Amino acid sequence: MFRTILGGKIHRATVTEADLNYVGSITVDQDLLDAAGICPNEKVAIVNNNNGERFETYTIAGKRGSGVICLNGAAARLVQKGDIVIIMSYIQLSEPEIAAHEPKVVLVDGNNKIRDIISYEPPHTVL
């Protein structure tokens, strides 16, 4: 049996742009994608901490070091520039694989620069 488990996430990133006229997706700084183990074109779930919206799309690699977090197409209606979002990818693992798996949690600063990468989420802690 396989279970769907958190693979990686970018925690509390700041939306830098919202482009309604683009075809779709979320553009994310390639450095952040790499750090979280998220691939270009991978399906991701997004939570907007400002308004509670939860939605899915796929990733497009943005310029390295740019800090870009741009929601494109219809998803641009669900965010505003400056909103705080969490970007999560999920993977399918077998029962034996789950015990050894450690998701990559990328913590960023207000400019979407990596400030830490952890493999766990402390309970009841604000990161």
Curated annotation (Swiss-Prot):
It catalyses: L-aspartate + H(+) = beta-alanine + CO2. It comes from the Bacteria. Its cofactor is pyruvate. Is synthesized initially as an inactive proenzyme, which is activated by self-cleavage at a specific serine bond to produce a beta-subunit with a hydroxyl group at its C-terminus and an alpha-subunit with a pyruvoyl group at its N-terminus. The active site is at 25 (schiff-base intermediate with substrate), 58 (proton donor). Transmembrane segments: none annotated. Its EC number is 4.1.1.11. Pfam families: Asp_decarbox. Catalyzes the pyruvoyl-dependent decarboxylation of aspartate to produce beta-alanine. Heterooctamer of four alpha and four beta subunits. This is Aspartate 1-decarboxylase. The lineage of its organism: Bacteria, Pseudomonadati, Pseudomonadota, Betaproteobacteria, Neisseriales. The gene is panD.
